[in-house]
């Protein structure tokens, strides 16, 4: 049912905007799509591609008219990288992104996605880009991560992995 709703929505987007639509497609999903293609014919503008590498995917996001995703990290990505986005989930775990207006949570219904697309695209065309979420705008993250890892490595090795680090005398 969800895949069918997504197909209907993507076809409507392709018809309305006349732009290529790139869908990062996992192999299992690709198999399901191939079984459905006869029933719901995808618009020729829709391209089902294998999952991209990290940097290629980020590049796709940054140069997209809008990113439509069910990813759990789309809120952070959209906020930090400042690209328009719509989350097609019914719920999420990042309320701070919603509070800042980083993206729109639409669900899978065609009308809601089309309505959300209009709003998000207009905002970015008018250069009304949401501010980065404060929680995501932290300085020196890599330095902090290194310190945390160094601080807890021995503890985790000892308590979780049961490695013995005691010094043995001769």
Question: Residue locations for each model-derived region?
Answer:
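Nucleotide-activated sugar donor-binding and catalytic core shared by glycosyltransferases
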Residues: 1-19, 24, 29-170
């Amino acid at each position: 049912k969800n895949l069918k709703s997504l197909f209907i929505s993507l076809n409507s987007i392709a018809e309305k905007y006349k732009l290529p639509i790139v869908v990062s497609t996992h192999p299992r999903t690709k198999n399901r799509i191939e079984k459905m293609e006869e029933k719901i014919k995808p618009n020729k503008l829709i391209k089902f591609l294998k999952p991209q590498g990290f940097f290629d995917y980020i590049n796709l996001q940054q140069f997209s008219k809008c990113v439509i995703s069910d990813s759990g990290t789309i809120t952070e990505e959209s906020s930090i990288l400042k690209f328009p986005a719509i989350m097609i989930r019914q719920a999420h775990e990042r309320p701070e992104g919603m509070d800042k207006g980083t993206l729109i949570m639409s669900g899978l219904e065609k009308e809601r996605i089309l309505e959300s697309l209009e709003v998000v695209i207009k905002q970015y065309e008018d250069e009304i880009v949401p501010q980065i979420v404060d929680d995501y705008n932290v300085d020196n993250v890599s330095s902090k991560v290194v310190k945390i890892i160094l601080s807890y490595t021995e503890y985790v090795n000892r308590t979780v992995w049961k490695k013995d680090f005691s010094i043995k005398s001769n």
